[in-house]
Amino acid sequence: MDILQSLNGRQKKAVTASPGPVLVLAGPGSGKTRVLTHRAAYLMSELQVQPFHMMAVTFTNKAAEEMKKRIDALLGRHTRGLTVGTFHSTCAGILRIEAAHIPVNQNYVIFDADDQLRVVKQVLKDLNYNE
């Protein structure tokens, strides 16, 4: 499959840009995820960039899984070593790996919205504050 075949001119320009960060600003449904997946596949297949030298981040777990599937489909193989995840999971992974280098307890927990609400309610209860 030709990685560039289904892309328009602007998308091709972003996909084939020199290796390094690329900023793509576009509205919903304009093909940003398509550009990101095609760029990852292009860099690996055409420029022999190693997967462990790249990272693709998005906002949802569903989108991250879809990106992985699309990249694998474009390349016709499973891509090992490529980091694809949400902003939160990717940053949490970096923190877990690098926590030894900063003054942070390595057993920290990242709270989601439900966890945060539960803690605030517990604190208010502990302070005898009526809602």
Model-derived features with residue positions:
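P-loop NTPase Walker
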Residues: M1-Q106
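DNA-processing P-loop NTPase/helicase core
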Residues: I97-E131
